[in-house]
Structures are given as C-alpha cells and as structure tokens.
Regions:
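TRNA-recognition modules of translation machinery and tRNA-sensing kinases, especially anticodon-binding
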Residues: 1-245
Length: 245
C-alpha cells in the first residue's frame, strides 16, 4: 500500500521518480482511483512471504522466483525502456554465503545456456556491509562528499543527505573522478561481513566463475546488504549494458 515504508519511500519516491509521485497524488482516470505500477519484484515477494508465513521460525528458507512486466517512470537511459520484463530469484530465511554464490553461479550458467559467451560477460561483485558496519561507513562517505561539494554535481549532493553511496553510481565524469578517492567499503566491513564476502569469493573460485571486485558497485535501496553483483555485456546499445544482478 501507499502507506507502507518500503513502497512509499523506497519504491515510488526513490526509484520511480517525481512523475509517478505526481500520478499517485493526482489520481488517474477517476478522481478517486489510483494507479500503482511495480518497479521490481522483490517487495512483492517479501510481502507474500510475510503474509503467508512461508519461512516459519526455525524452518527451511524459501527459494522463490518471479517473472513479469515491470515499470519505471523516470526518463530511461539509452537502451532502457520504461516497461520491461524481469525474471528474478529470491531466497529468504538464510544468510549463508553459499546462497549468494548459488544465485551468482546460477545466473552465469543461465546466460551461457542461452548462448551468451562467457568471455563477453563481466561479473562485478562487491559487499555493501550490514546494519552494523554500513552506517559508520555511510557517514564517512557523506563527510568526504561534503569536503568536495564544489566538485560534485547537484544530484550527488542531494544524494549525500539521503543515501551518499549512490554517488558511486553517478555517470558524471567529474563526480566519478572525485569518488575514485572516496573511502572504500572493503576497508570498513565488520568481521562478520568480511568473512561472508571472502567465503562468497571462495565459492566462486571453486566453481570456476571469474569475477571482478568493484567497490563502486552499490544499490540505492536500504534493504540491500552484503553481497551485490552485476553482469555486464557489450551489447552496442549504449550506456545500458547491465543484463542482470
């Protein structure tokens, strides 16, 4: 619903932009009707798991998948559409590094199965830490950005107040240059997150899956913790070269 935090704050405002917010506030066909289009599948999966108690306390984790059309209201980058189809997998009720490695290995094997050559793909990985170590790191990045405010774009400085880690994803060349020298999350992980990240890499190594560590790889929603990953391929379509993650 509109009143729930994960939908109102993160999905509509942060992801879908002001255009969708105005649409929600102003109504649609009738004065009392509202239109809500899902930007991705994770929130719906989490809601279903909570509603139907699919992960009872002490029970086995729930491994689920979804597929269907998703929608984004912001102006799309080159090669990206406002409506697109997305396939995703979710595992809830487990924190082991084997789960993250399993998802990554499964994705890479899927791409190879449908004919994408392994040598044409780049697998990028990073750890975003957890609720124990990320807040302090986020403050370090915010302080760094404030020290370099005159070198960063307006969007980045707005993000500095809400989620400074998003500045690592800025496409502005000047901002990218400044953020190259920003504090790196790998230097500020707590012992548990460091052990988790090292285990994920060990499993990928054992499976023969090549990867590159990219400290600039972040996600804009607060529910992302620890391992994040992205698969890129040179598709000749412009800036949108990420095909999964």
């Amino acid at each position: 619903g509109e009143a729930t935090d994960v939908v109102s704050k993160e999905m509509f405002t942060a992801v879908s932009g002001e255009n969708l917010k105005r649409l929600i506030d102003g109504g649609t066909i009738k004065s009392k009707s509202r239109l809500s289009l899902r930007p991705e599948g994770t929130a719906g999966v989490v809601r279903a798991v909570a509603q139907h108690d699919l992960v009872p306390q002490g029970g086995a984790p729930a491994k689920l998948m979804y597929a269907g059309p998703m929608f984004r209201a912001e102006r799309p980058q080159k090669g990206r559409q406002r409506q697109f189809n997305q396939v995703g997998v979710e595992c809830l009720g487990a924190e082991e590094p084997t789960i993250d490695a399993e998802a990554i290995i499964m994705l890479m094997r899927f791409y190879e199965t449908i004919g994408i050559p392994r040598e044409s793909m780049r697998l990028l990985i990073n750890s975003m830490g957890c609720e124990k170590c990320r807040p302090a790191y986020r403050e370090l990045v915010r302080s760094y950005m404030n020290e370099h405010a005159d070198e960063l774009c307006e969007t980045c400085m707005t993000r500095a107040e809400i989620n400074p880690l998003r500045a690592f994803d800025c496409k502005n060349e000047g901002c990218a240059h400044v953020m190259e020298s920003a504090p790196k999350i790998s230097d500020h992980l707590c012992p548990d997150c460091r052990e988790h990240y090292e285990a994920v890499k060990a499993y990928l190594d054992a499976a023969g899956v090549a990867y590159e560590e990219d400290y600039k790889l972040v996600r804009g929603l607060d529910y992302y913790t620890r391992t994040v990953f992205e698969v890129q391929v040179d598709n000749g379509m412009g800036s949108q070269n990420a095909i999964g993650g």
